[in-house]
Amino acid sequence: MRFMLLMLQLLGLLLLLAGGVQSVYCPAGCTCLERTVRCIRAKLSAVPKLPQDTQTLDLRFNHIEELPANAFSGLAQLTTLFLNDNELAYLQDGALNGLTALRFVYLNNNRLSRLPATIFQRMPRLEAIFLENNDIWQLPAGLFDNLPRLNRLIMYNNKLTQLPVDGFNRLNNLKRLRLDGNAIDCNCGVYSLWRRWHLDVQRQLVSISLTCAAPQMLQNQGFSSLGEHHFKCAKPQFLVAPQDAQVAAGEQVELSCEVTGLPRPQITWMHNTQELGLEEQAQAEILPSGSLLIRSADTSDMGIYQCIARNEMGALRSQPVRLVVNGGNHPLDSPIDARSNQVWADAGTPMHGATPLPSPLPSPPHFTHQPHDQIVALHGSGHVLLDCAASGWPQPDIQWFVNGRQLLQSTPSLQLQANGSLILLQPNQLSAGTYRCEARNSLGSVQATARIELKELPEILTAPQSQTIKLGKAFVLECDADGNPLPTIDWQLNGVPLPGNTPDLQLENENTELVVGAARQEHAGVYRCTAHNENGETSVEATIKVERSQSPPQLAIEPSNLVAITGTTIELPCQADQPEDGLQISWRHDGRLIDPNVQLAEKYQISGAGSLFVKNVTIPDGGRYECQLKNQFGRASASALVTIRNNVDLAPGDRYVRIAFAEAAKEIDLAINNTLDMLFSNRSDKAPPNYGELLRVFRFPTGEARQLARAAEIYERTLVNIRKHVQEGDNLTMKSEEYEFRDLLSREHLHLVAELSGCMEHREMPNCTDMCFHSRYRSIDGTCNNLQHPTWGASLTAFRRLAPPIYENGFSMPVGWTKGMLYSGHAKPSARLVSTSLVATKEITPDARITHMVMQWGQFLDHDLDHAIPSVSSESWDGIDCKKSCEMAPPCYPIEVPPNDPRVRNRRCIDVVRSSAICGSGMTSLFFDSVQHREQINQLTSYIDASQVYGYSTAFAQELRNLTSQEGLLRVGVHFPRQKDMLPFAAPQDGMDCRRNLDENTMSCFVSGDIRVNEQVGLLAMHTIWMREHNRIASKLKQINSHWDGDTLYQEARKIVGAQMQHITFKQWLPLIIGESGMEMMGEYQGYNPQLNPSIANEFATAALRFGHTIINPILHRLNETFQPIPQGHLLLHKAFFAPWRLAYEGGVDPLMRGFLAVPAKLKTPDQNLNTELTEKLFQTAHAVALDLAAINIQRGRDHGMPGYNVYRKLCNLTVAQDFEDLAGEISSAEIRQKMKELYGHPDNVDVWLGGILEDQVEGGKVGPLFQCLLVEQFRRLRDGDRLYYENPGVFSPEQLTQIKQANFGRVLCDVGDNFDQVTENVFILAKHQGGYKKCEDIIGINLYLWQECGRCNSPPAIFDSYIPQTYTKRSNRQKRDLGKENDEVATAESYDSPLESLYDVNEERVSGLEELIGSFQKELKKLHKKLRKLEDSCNSADSEPVAQVVQLAAAPPQLVSKPKRSHCVDDKGTTRLNNEVWSPDVCTKCNCFHGQVNCLRERCGEVSCPPGVDPLTPPEACCPHCPMVK
């Protein structure tokens, strides 16, 4: 028996284990504990297979982009679902099917833009939905119906602008609704929510956060401060309803339907239950009143009609009516056919005069509404509604049972309703339990049960009190609460959470006291105190008003000058900053008081706000109008000049200028501010930034550049708005494309638009008279290089053009904007289609000669030369987000994705934003005398001047300097082990944050002279190298010239760094790109040419220099000192973007630099152009689809209006191809030419960047003939048009120039790398082609002692007469010349553009000059020896004679003094040492000579014990080792 019992126990255990095997199944990459499955950062792209008993599922921080239908099938026990911080963009209908037990769902921090209407259906237990930080722009009707337990709905920081009417009205248990952070229009959708909240007696227990963005009168107003008077909403109601009608065939009939409602309802008509299609029935028309007019009725018009009126508040249906058309067979009282009977029965109302319908068929009861479980607050002040309604025949009876006992009649706490529902009044502890509703008739019964649960919410003990506070006075709000557990207290002001302690607002005593030290106007509003614990929350409110204390009134809106035409009505606005009792408003016209009560009322009218209306103006009504505000403490006034003109004097659009400008400024600034908020707002409660956001941040224009671009956008938008107003106001019939803005606006008003927008605030002409500076150094912003044209090559100026652009409207509209427009008889192909067909490649062939450093130097150089400012907003002027729309709406310029794209299937486009235009180009050129095409802004200086190291504006450059000492250094950041100085981190106020994944890294962005420094780690390493090189040079110059101040050291080091970059570019890098033939085209340097404009050409920046994309490897190799991979391995290109931490923590700059100089670049072949890392994976985590660099290059050329490939071939004296076979000489691949023909149709249609990269490379170069020509043209200008080019005589002395020509990037790596000991002599050529690697000591560098300044008092010796780096004061401290003064005498520009004539060459006198210098030094040395001997004699005599004798000896004539015997020493090296001379033969020994005897003392070093892992170091010029400081 015992054995049998043991066997049974063993069998039970086995069964238990067998049952548990299935339940403990855990997906790969996840952790499972009991019934919780956590798959955090498991790199999932879909929902894995899960155990069916899972209750909590955590899928955070994965890559799930879409949820299909039934994604969680079989998980009926799941209660909590975490899907936040994924990449969710789409939820298919039914994605959450089967989750009947779900209580909490987290969908926040994703990319959702819409939700299926039934996504949350059949979830009766759902308590909380978290949807914040998505892109949801619309909520479908009924989305939140049938969620009886939902108490928290969090949707802040989305894109909502409208709320559905009654969208939240069925959430009877809702306690918290957050909609803040959405630009919501407080219209009727908000009204329905407000009305439901206002009528709820428990509204004190419901927290709703919402701030109005529109209409303007409600802007920034919180939800709780809204009132009934703020809304204009009413449901539709019939004034005249339709009636039955009878008409003869061919006659006209009108079915009346007049409706009222706010907003005005839309009318539709139904015919036989189908919506009436008026476009298909020309004889039918809906009149403005809403009535239906049928002009010529026939038998097909017979049937049942119904009028439907809809607005935001709901829909209203009329009773169905019948129309009978008499053709002889259809009298009104004849029986209707079966189909009409059915239609009539469907409409649900008996028809007057029609055959009576049969009684309804008997049916058992079925529910139309049934009760749902609810959680009720204990001691709440409201009621609870349990719905119960049923239909059937006979009509069912409704009965209620509470905890099994029938409720026969209403009680003080339970109220039975006539419709069958039950209301719980003042719920208490006895109200908890089970409530059953039963519907019964003679054919059966049905029942439904609901559970009422009670929770004790926090109880407010002390509530804040509403107060009226005087301006500047302190006040305190107290709010204390009790509960179990003890609640916490939060505060809100006007619906916005208070951030905590600020300088003028303090939260004290665990947030129970809110203290404001000095009340200001922004402190006025509704304060909400919320006490919350795990059971829920309770809120109370108090209103604080801030009164102005005994001060004169202030004007919030002042009148402005205006021009009006005769016969119109003008409005002059005038409004106080706040209403107050006793405020008097008066107007005067040319000093005469205007009183509408005394003068003609039909002439003048003063509104309640204070505005003056002057009606039917005439010429005498012109003049100065003054508005005056007066109270008991003083007055305020403002005036405006009104000019009245006859109608013939004005252009049609003049009257709309200020209105259109105000609209434009608001639209542009809103788009810019939204973009700024998206890019730079505090991310403490948001997901870390993704690649695309970082790209936008680092390319986003700085303040000065942003203002320049903003002015152009406002100008352009103003003109568009003026045209809109003229069209609407004057009903002009002129076609849009025929508009000329000169016809719409007078010249005076064109200038007014320019002035308002800021386009007239052109850059002031720079002051170039400080030749002590400009003759030696570059300005930071590039001005004053060419003294005849000071802005040539300067930052924030327009690009230069080689050929006129081909904008579609002639001056601004990009190529391809108008769909279907033909070029050379063919449409422009999609840039994406061109990329996938001709450019992208997965295959990579290594180059046989050049290193990957060629690519990296090219990118670094490009960031010194050009940066086309992107649009200052990523939203269109009409509020469309370019990332989420495929609409062509400025500045959005998306790339169309063709059908059957190999990768992009879920989007129609790839988002691209246009480059900003400079004022005076495109549409903004209209206020000049001639229309100029749109031109883009170059944010950088055009010169090769190391602006990517130092910045492009004076303010930016100052931020990068270390101004704490006079050493001329650039700022450095924190120190990392075994690495030299790193770049400084970006300041918090810069809004830059590179921490994409806080588990992966917490490092901030670095900052340098170009804002794109963090784009990829190779570029970041290059910036770090040159920052270190500047500081190395500045420190060495400080040792050589200790009397130089910090500015001189900074400018001299900057000048040397810029010269090194010029030499490396022109002598070592460029020959490998353009080949020997290209260098012959460049020619030898013949000196500076002041007539040559060095500004960057648009074609160079947009097309030619982008050849470098074709030589990029998909991998960045990282090698150690032995040129083997580092332990962290190589780096895939797409992982190198915005990852500064990899530079600091994965080996520093050395491994990347070794990889660049040791690994070959990618070889460009006809079928291998751009690797797919750039066309298919670029910033794939940042956009709805990953970007495509090739497609963007093509689209950018079209945005800039680039002419076709053939235009530039002609410009470069290449053959102009008539067909694609004519290109065989440059594009040898017949397959490539055939694909080009299929895509473009004609060579004229080919995009210039594409044509350029597809050409075969010239011999010895990396570009084809076209790009060779364009590169030569630009680099020649950069060399010959630069007055401070390093080879221009006078820029450096001959000796210094010799040193600059020894500059070598390999030597720079040796000097400032962390641990470089061997490099190649030319880092751009593979080691095997130059004899392998060399030791660093074998690489020649620059000898900085040739910069030693030996002269004093501004009179240096002859050796430095050709170069005088004298110290100078800061430019900001110098007196600046007023350009308006004519009496200033300034040297002519020609004298400064030539080599400095006052400096002469003394090469022939070099030897004699040196001999004279040595002779003068010898004389000075003899004098010093003589004085020293006298001092020795005096000291020696003092040792043996009395002091008196010493005095006497000193007073005796020199010829009577006897000379003592000379004392000296000879050291171990044979050097003669004077008596008492002290010297150090080495760093540890000090010796002295005393009376012929050498005495030496050697320093002894003690034992050094360092922490584990730290080795003792002996610094230079030190004797003993010590432990280095570890940070």
Swiss-Prot record:
<dbReference type="InterPro" id="IPR013098">
    <property type="entry name" value="Ig_I-set"/>
</dbReference>
<feature type="disulfide bond">
    <location>
        <begin position="882"/>
        <end position="892"/>
    </location>
</feature>
<dbReference type="Pfam" id="PF07679">
    <property type="entry name" value="I-set"/>
</dbReference>
<comment type="similarity">
    <text>Belongs to the peroxidase family. XPO subfamily.</text>
</comment>
<dbReference type="GO" id="GO:0005615">
    <property type="term" value="C:extracellular space"/>
</dbReference>
<dbReference type="InterPro" id="IPR037120">
    <property type="entry name" value="Haem_peroxidase_sf_animal"/>
</dbReference>
<feature type="disulfide bond">
    <location>
        <begin position="1212"/>
        <end position="1269"/>
    </location>
</feature>
<dbReference type="InterPro" id="IPR001007">
    <property type="entry name" value="VWF_dom"/>
</dbReference>
<feature type="glycosylation site" description="N-linked (GlcNAc...) asparagine">
    <location>
        <position position="1120"/>
    </location>
</feature>
<dbReference type="InterPro" id="IPR007110">
    <property type="entry name" value="Ig-like_dom"/>
</dbReference>
<keyword id="KW-0325">Glycoprotein</keyword>
<comment type="subunit">
    <text>Homotrimer; disulfide-linked.</text>
</comment>
<feature type="repeat" description="LRR 2">
    <location>
        <begin position="75"/>
        <end position="98"/>
    </location>
</feature>
<dbReference type="GO" id="GO:0046872">
    <property type="term" value="F:metal ion binding"/>
</dbReference>
<feature type="glycosylation site" description="N-linked (GlcNAc...) asparagine">
    <location>
        <position position="767"/>
    </location>
</feature>
<feature type="binding site">
    <location>
        <position position="941"/>
    </location>
    <ligand>
        <name>Ca(2+)</name>
    </ligand>
</feature>
<keyword id="KW-0393">Immunoglobulin domain</keyword>
<keyword id="KW-0732">Signal</keyword>
<dbReference type="GO" id="GO:0020037">
    <property type="term" value="F:heme binding"/>
</dbReference>
<feature type="repeat" description="LRR 1">
    <location>
        <begin position="51"/>
        <end position="74"/>
    </location>
</feature>
<feature type="disulfide bond">
    <location>
        <begin position="574"/>
        <end position="627"/>
    </location>
</feature>
<keyword id="KW-0106">Calcium</keyword>
<feature type="glycosylation site" description="N-linked (GlcNAc...) asparagine">
    <location>
        <position position="962"/>
    </location>
</feature>
<feature type="disulfide bond">
    <location>
        <begin position="768"/>
        <end position="784"/>
    </location>
</feature>
<feature type="binding site" description="covalent">
    <location>
        <position position="1015"/>
    </location>
    <ligand>
        <name>heme b</name>
    </ligand>
</feature>
<feature type="repeat" description="LRR 6">
    <location>
        <begin position="172"/>
        <end position="196"/>
    </location>
</feature>
<dbReference type="InterPro" id="IPR019791">
    <property type="entry name" value="Haem_peroxidase_animal"/>
</dbReference>
<feature type="glycosylation site" description="N-linked (GlcNAc...) asparagine">
    <location>
        <position position="682"/>
    </location>
</feature>
<feature type="repeat" description="LRR 3">
    <location>
        <begin position="99"/>
        <end position="122"/>
    </location>
</feature>
<dbReference type="Pfam" id="PF03098">
    <property type="entry name" value="An_peroxidase"/>
</dbReference>
<dbReference type="InterPro" id="IPR010255">
    <property type="entry name" value="Haem_peroxidase_sf"/>
</dbReference>
<dbReference type="InterPro" id="IPR034824">
    <property type="entry name" value="Peroxidasin_peroxidase"/>
</dbReference>
<dbReference type="InterPro" id="IPR036179">
    <property type="entry name" value="Ig-like_dom_sf"/>
</dbReference>
<feature type="domain" description="LRRNT">
    <location>
        <begin position="24"/>
        <end position="53"/>
    </location>
</feature>
<feature type="binding site">
    <location>
        <position position="864"/>
    </location>
    <ligand>
        <name>Ca(2+)</name>
    </ligand>
</feature>
<feature type="binding site">
    <location>
        <position position="945"/>
    </location>
    <ligand>
        <name>Ca(2+)</name>
    </ligand>
</feature>
<feature type="glycosylation site" description="N-linked (GlcNAc...) asparagine">
    <location>
        <position position="616"/>
    </location>
</feature>
<dbReference type="InterPro" id="IPR000372">
    <property type="entry name" value="LRRNT"/>
</dbReference>
<feature type="binding site">
    <location>
        <position position="943"/>
    </location>
    <ligand>
        <name>Ca(2+)</name>
    </ligand>
</feature>
<dbReference type="GO" id="GO:0016684">
    <property type="term" value="F:oxidoreductase activity, acting on peroxide as acceptor"/>
</dbReference>
<dbReference type="GO" id="GO:0006909">
    <property type="term" value="P:phagocytosis"/>
</dbReference>
<keyword id="KW-0433">Leucine-rich repeat</keyword>
